[in-house]
Amino acid sequence: MLASKHTPWRRLQGISFGMYSAEELKKLSVKSITNPRYVDYLGNPSANGLYDLALGPADSKEVCATCVQDFNNCSGHLGHIDLPLTVYNPFLFDKLYLLLRGSCLSCHMLTCPRAAIYLLISQLRVLEVGALQAVYELERILSRFLEETGDPSAFEIQEELEEYTSKILQNNLLGSQGTHVKNVCESRSKLVAQFWKTHMAAKQCPHCKTGRSVVRKEHNSKLIITYPATVHKKSDQEGTELPEGVPEAPGIDKAQMGKRGYLTPSSAQEHLFAIWKNEGFFLNYLFSGLDDIGPESSFNPSMFFLDFIVVPPSRYRPVNRLGDQMFTNGQTVNLQAVMKDAVLIRKLLALMAQEQKLPCEMTELTIDKENDSSVAIDRSFLGLLPGPSLTDKLYNIWIRLQSHVNIVFDSEMDKLMLEKYPGIRQILEKKEGLFRKHMMGKRVDYAARSVICPDMYINTNEIGIPMVFATKLTYPQPVTPWNVQELRQAVINGPNVHPGASMVINEDGSRTALSSVDAAQREAVAKQLLTPATGAPKPQGTKVVCRHVKNGDILLLNRQPTLHRPSIQAHRARILPEEKVLRLHYANCKAYNADFDGDEMNAHFPQSELGRAEAYVLACTDQQYLVPKDGQPLAGLIQDHMVSGANMTIRGCFFTREQYMELVYRGLTDKVGRVKLFPPAILKPFPLWTGKQVVSTLLINIIPEDYAPLNLSGKAKIGSKAWVKEKPRPIPDFDPDSMCESQVIIREGELLCGVLDKAHYGSSAYGLVHCCYEIYGGETSGRVLTCLARLFTAYLQLYRGFTLGVEDILVKPNADVVRQRIIEESTQCGPQAVKAALSLPETASCDEIQGKWQDAHLSKDQRDFNMIDMKFKEEVNHYSNEINKACMPLGLHRQFPENNLQMMVQSGAKGSTVNTMQISCLLGQIELEGRRPPLMASGKSLPCFEPYEFTPRAGGFVTGRFLTGIRPPEFFFHCMAGREGLVDTAVKTSRSGYLQRCIIKHLEGLVIQYDLTVRDSDGSVVQFLYGEDGLDIPKTQFLQPKQFPFLAGNYEVIMKSKHLHEVLSRADPQKVLGHIKAIKKWHHKHSGALLRKGAFLSFSQKIQAAVKALNLKGSIQNGRSPETQQMLQMWYDLDEESRWKYQKRAAPCPDPSLSVWRPDIYFASVSETFEKKIDDFSQEWAAQAERSYKKSELSLDRLRTLLQLKWQRSLCDPGEAVGLLAAQSIGEPSTQMTLNTFHFAGRGEMNVTLGIPRLREILMVASANIKTPMMSVPVFDTKKALKKVKSLKKRLTRVCLGEVLQKVDIQESFCMGEKRNKFQVYELRFQFLPHAYYQQEKCLRPEDILHFMETRFFKLLMEAIKKKKNKASAFRNVNSRRATQKDLNDTEDSGRSQREEERDEEEEGNIVDAEAEEGDADASDTKRKEKQEEEVDYESEEEGEEEEEEEVQEEGNIKGDGVHQGHEPDEEEHLGLEEEESSQKPPRRHSRPQGAEAIKRRIQAVRESYSFIEDYQYDTEESLWCQVTVKLPLMKINFDMSSLVVSLAHKAIVYTTKGITRCLLNETTNSKNEKELVLNTEGINLPELFKYSEILDLRRLYSNDIHAMANTYGIEAALRVIEKEIKDVFAVYGIAVDPRHLSLVADYMCFEGVYKPLNRFGIQSSSSPLQQMTFETSFQFLKQATMMGSHDELKSPSACLVVGKVVKGGTGLFELKQPLR
């Protein structure tokens, strides 16, 4: 036992947050600090300074003046700085601002309706007992009550709500347990936030009818107030009696009406006290956390103000000494600034008191200083203070004091200061802050770190430890009579000799260090190990020896980045003298993602028996064979072993007796006991053993004695084709794979056929090692790996060797000739590709083709250019395939298996076929970011090519090969591709790291409980069964039908290892089997029925005819005919029995057995899919058994029970931290996704967001406006639908003016008149494309375009020109005018603040980039963010410059269309979108007006509607052009009209279906392998598609916008969309993530019934404040927790870590109780 003082006897149960009151702080403070200098000239702390010794010693030399203890024992004491004037509390300043804004300064009441107040109080009260539903019920009661009674009084409302509330509170059974749950927390914070947002806006007071006063905050340090112009005084003010001692709060003076002034903290305080008097009963609920500790006292409004500042003890702001210089701590500097201000203010106040010039509210503050007024005051300090009069000086320094106080709390609050010292917020937040650096991650002892190097002779579960570490790392081992001998020897050896000891801990906890030089001391200690200590209080327990690590001790190894569970595993130590590095077996490299180019790893030595037990049993390498991401194996042998193994097991590899024995011995060096051997395969002329027999010998010796050896049929990685040298003779029914070397057959532990390669001992599924793991467990599979590694190494070392030569890469001469010919052909394919891409006629000349190519390259829309790229790639791909066919594999000089390079590639050792092709055939097409190398503006790809050259070489098609060398330009392309890979690697790490952190912080608490549900740490159920079937991913690998034969083949072993007989004797599957039978019976009966019929339905169908015949007369009642009523009556009159007959026939299908019977308790309760798999397999098995010659020993029933047992054994264990596993399984693969695998869309394809950007969109932002929204709907396969869908596609496609405009001609001239009459004249002629050009694609006619020009485009043009001018003038003269009365006009001002608020809200919702602020991303992010912010600022400046009417109109536009605003970056884009409402329907056909009169009228209309249009003409015949003359007043600034018109033309939308930009028809194959058409749209508008139900199969409509799906189809649909979207992102990169992880993440995100992101806005609903604070924006969450008075139950993992509790997960989920008897 450890000494008693280390034994914990108390545990934290919870933490609550609150604030100290002023009185308590005054009592806690030991000293008032008044001296701004903190050290004197000698560097000693000065009295009353910030390092006064009363606050505790600042370093080890001093003694505390308060408690007279030294630095180690005194924990420090608080002091305080008195402030001469009240200041705002920066912590609560924003709430104070809202309170003042939402209350009336005249009658001191809140301006929100009384109903809202009483409703909120009632809602918060019912939430205190966790009654969630009552919240919505209260809303309903209130709205009904308000409808019924016209204008109820506050008292009536209160009565009505109180009646319901009290009922709820009385019936409450849960007590306060229900309140710390996610849903309740979410609801509470939502209600309060909603209240602040809606009811705290400035509006007219409903009580005293005073106009609204506008409050603005500036720089977080002062409040500017604009008083209302009218004040209504009540005539009867006597009604409100004031209690004694409360000064009557000032109202609003006559003088102040309509003025604007500075609201001092003291007047704000008076006003707040007055509000509190009136509204305190309610505000106490809003600020429940700010109560003083006593239960009676309610919230204290003085919390919003500070009269003094608390000074933390000196030891928490130590002085940093560097040489003989002293550097002060940042906190001290901030406090010093406050003190300097306080001194100045005191002087100023004394001076003003003398001159009697104090402003009215200050008089009582300075009465006490009156007595010394006679003393003359030094006035020299006044020069330091800004401001003309003394009062101004006072106000200015007061504001300065306020901003210095702010800095103490948060240095970001003062935006103007340049050199910033960290405030309290900076100490807590970010990665370097207290929470994340010191509470969540702590440094540890008993750890080691060194470089790793490989070693294939140790076991896979071992780690080689150098002697340096072995003598430093120790383990505290209690001395007992059993181990005393060993420990004595260790003590005698001492700290430097291994195995020794470094220290002995005595019974009372004192430590004796063992001397390295004094052997006598060590012997003395060694002799007394078992003698009990003497002394008065007999200490209990035994001595403990800290002994060195020895062989077989367990160590935890870890390599950063620790991205998933296998990055930390437990290894057994093997001490290797003479080493300085850690030695790691090759097989573990993949798990750690380690290579040996200088990687370092950390080792940790667990210090308790519990920790060791967990490491040996759970974290051991043998148990980590499968990765939790998708259950694939991680450990596997590496390159040389593959080559060696494949060569060794090939037919025709023989060994003599000596060689056989040598190899077997090398493989089984550490086997204890006899080695079983095989008889030789060849007896004459002398005995020889095959390589396969060597492997078999190993296997039967490794498999545990009491288990049957394994049976396995599998495939090798080397395919059967590779072994075939020439064409085989035709044989009927010949299967080329059977008995071939690519088919691996193991029977009873003997390898009979096939080659062993990567597929069997690499990290690949269902190989030999995986099967051993499955049947015999991790220990055996680990030994198989170890022994095979030794064997294959020995084979290479002793007998074989492995090398590559030039001969392996040479190509036969005739193949070379073919290759040369194909390369020559390929140079001619360029023009063909461009023609195909741009669909040009065959006869087109080269110049014409080049011209078109140039147009495509330089045009803004890159689709055509991408198309050319794609066609080129297709062409050259064809050629590279031809070349490869000619040279590989038959064109090579040497063939497999003699060809060592091919052997290496085929067996999976290293390299790929691509590598061999690049060596022997050609390099192929070089690609950058998924496309050919880009062209320069001149049209060349590199300077050495012609512009727009047709040869594929110029586009990066390298026909050279490494064998014969490549040319400089080709080499350059090759290097470009190599560089791209490096860039990606560097950029993607920070992105994916932050993504993973977000997911982990959210899901960390999800753990499987003992009832198999997945719950969050507060007990809220996220899934009833993990992954919806409760299975553990690594255990499910062999539950696939393909692996059933393997399980059947090894029935004996599995039955024994899984204890089948014991299970069957205890578990009775009858209940479940009966249930399954019932389900099958129901399905059998109702197989044909699509619709379920109810009992009454079948009854009415039966008697319908009879009732009709009665011809009943009568009227329809409630929409029911007399016949229906008659039938109802007859149904009610039926007797029980006959009605039961009908009901029985209509009984619903019973629930699946999994949902009725808990799978861990009831045997054979499996999921429906698995049940179906078992059924199918048993039928196959039975059919096979009938066909086969010998009868199988395995009966069908036994096979079924075996599979059911395997399923039950695969259930996930309680305590498994599935949330973390899911987070790691998404985060870890995301680091492998290269950032820039973009998908460049050609003309016929959709743009899709891929990779990490898409993952961030789904998981971290849950954004409502995604970058590439799309819908896809299959088209019905009927003639009618297929015909109509073409026109539908046309109708849904958006048309921009730029797409139908051929060219614009612009002529510019000047018209010079008198002074003011100078004009610029532009003549614009728009020429449109002929109708034939776009007839197929677009749903438009020329006259529609003309109409659009006249009605919309000219207006847009006018607005754009106006904007250009305003921008220009704004830049030219920076407006520096004084604020005029108009600015102060309250209507406009409030409008501004309203908008400002809205913008703030916007910013809240729109995380520009959460992590850039969080310090979690790289520098480039921060730069980019600053840039974004700069741009935002610019926009806001321009808005102000516009004329008001235009602004109003803009507002109108913007509000018009909600869907698009989110991601249109520039205001100008909205102008085009305005059209959207008008053009929902296809454009109306304007009949062309005939006759000169009509034409004139039309021209006149255009000229009249636009002031700046001088003249207008249009094509009256064809509507193919129009010409307009624009006359503008001459300005100093010139702008480019043509670029303006072009950019507008691209933005202006002639016709659109709201939300949809483009439509495509693609052909795909569906699940039944039938071809079908699918309509894909870019953009989303679900209701629009619902109109075409006869063309589109709406039941299979899909969209990638999760919010749209949730709003249309409900949250369960959104859940499936999230799963599918994440799966699709990974699928692009070929990464498989188990669907159970995805379903858990999706379930968590939709837990509250809405789709919430995994970022700091999503964590707001968490019930653990500590979890929120350790995530992001700690200060914000701390503030919230303090104000709400939150309580943390310390259940979430983060909270447990912060306070040092064991996390409630894994082995921490349960407690062990000792039986005391």
UniProtKB/Swiss-Prot annotation:
UniProt main location, coarse: nucleus
EC number, as in UniProt: 2.7.7.6
Region feature Involved in RRN3 binding to Pol I complex, mapped onto this chain: 475-549
Positions with a binding annotation for DNA nontemplate strand: R436
Chain positions recorded as RNA binding sites: R559, D599
Residues that hold Zn(2+) 2 according to the record: C104, C107, C205, C208
Region Rudder, residue ranges: 410-423
Region feature Bridging helix, mapped onto this chain: 967-1008
Region (Clamp): 110-201, 327-433
GO biological process assignments: negative regulation of protein localization to nucleolus; transcription by RNA polymerase I
Keywords: Chromosome, DNA-directed RNA polymerase, Magnesium, Metal-binding, Nucleotidyltransferase, Nucleus, Phosphoprotein, Transcription, Transferase, Zinc
CDD domains in the record: RNAP_I_Rpa1_C (cd02735), RNAP_I_RPA1_N (cd01435)
Binding site for DNA template strand: K431, R436, R443, R1256
Swiss-Prot/TrEMBL catalytic activity: RNA(n) + a ribonucleoside 5'-triphosphate = RNA(n+1) + diphosphate
Composition bias type Acidic residues, residue spans: 1398-1419, 1429-1450, 1465-1477
Swiss-Prot/TrEMBL domain comment: The clamps form the DNA-binding cleft.
Designated name of the protein: DNA-directed RNA polymerase I subunit RPA1
Organism: Mus musculus (Mouse)
